[in-house]
Amino acid sequence: MKILVMGGTRFVGKSLVSKLLNQNHDIDIFTRGNKSNPDNTNLIKGDRNDIECIHKLKNKKYDVIFDISGREVEQTKLLIENLDDSFHRYIYVSSAGVYKDNYELPLSEESPLDTNSRHKGKFETENWLVEKKIPFTSFRPTYIYGPGNYNKIENWFFERLFHLKSIPIPADGSLITQLGHVSDLSDVMI
């Protein structure tokens, strides 16, 4: 398959691209970053907020698009409106941060969303994809850990475990959360 990965040279993207390459897919990576691209991929350098950069994708045909870097609905609109529309599936990495604080588990697509969340653009993107009838799958992972993680929160947690330090739990101590490994997230997305 011909695959476009938006943001494929860091953490989740790096794990995903590695697994896709193991399945012998033809991969284009669109990134603004300075990380080197993996062998056997085509790096397309550009800022997804810049229409001139997005035009580099204009005449390319993809079977699947993995969007790891999208944060705002305008970014997704710009991308999709400038792509050949023959792709079969748009796979979007959202966030569990779109949900309101909720003590009823498990969460589902119908669970209340936090319209003031810093992840508001993620659920606005999902709503736009539904409205436009674009074939998509959205993943809403929680805290992701694993090789290449650049977020301090998850590393802080494991550092405390490794050094046998206590891990403070907010409120009355009954709060639960779940961490997911980057490799598991990549597997389920494929």
List where the protein language model places each region.
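Conserved beta-loop-beta element that borders a ligand/cofactor-binding pocket
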Residues: E126-G148
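Glycine-rich "substrate-gating" loop/helix at the edge of Rossmann-like oxidoreductase active sites
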Residues: T142-N151, A171-G180
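N-terminal Rossmann-fold cofactor-binding loop
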Residues: F30-K35, D47-R48
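Short amphipathic alpha-helix with an adjacent loop that forms part of the alpha/beta core around
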Residues: I51-K61
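NAD(P)-cofactor binding segment of oxidoreductase domains
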Residues: K60-P106, E110, K120-W128
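Rossmann-fold cofactor-recognition segment
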Residues: N40-D50, S69-R71
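Alpha-helical substrate-binding/gating segment
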Residues: F158-P168, L175-I190
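N-terminal Rossmann NAD(P)H-binding glycine-rich loop of SDR-like oxidoreductase domains
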Residues: I3-Q23
